[in-house]
Amino acid sequence: VHPDRHAGPQAGHADRLTRITAVAPAVTFYTFALAIHIAAVVIAFGVTFAYPVMYAVGIRSEARSMPGVHRIQDSVGKFVISPFLGLALLAGIYLASKLHTWSDFYVQWGLGVILLLGALGGAFFAPRERKLAELAERDVAAAGSGEVSFSQEYKDLRKLVFRVGGVANVLILLTIYFMTAQTGA
């Protein structure tokens, strides 16, 4: 006969509580890290899906605002996207290490995409967004009080940034799918 059976209905309950409590902090921290990872991705990249709308509205109805739009993009890259990309990476490293999933496709894909997006942010988007601001400012100044007509140089660079941004957004969506489905796990 088990000794707890004679000690009443609550006997053994404290032991079970101790075992549950000992496991709970690890589960809670993992869940916290997962929430941080997801939130960091949403904060870092959510705005990038609004950029095409900002471009369209700016070009069509607020052409004089385009230098500011590009400066805002540059600042968002520095102060929102980059830091939260770093946080998503750190949380992802913890999650992959905790679950020992480094060899799974979705982890390798996610790591590759986050490193690529970080590199694109610093080496591609930031300098081109600053250049777009300069070109737009020049074109707005050249228009004087008349209608703004953007130069071909501005249009070509804006189109390039728009296309690369579109590819980046597709990579983000694919990564979300692969992570959710745990593709290759």
Predicted regions: what is each one?
Residues P3, A7-A14, T18:
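Short linear motifs in low-complexity or flexible loops
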Residues R16-A185:
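Polytopic transmembrane helical bundles with strong interfacial aromatic enrichment
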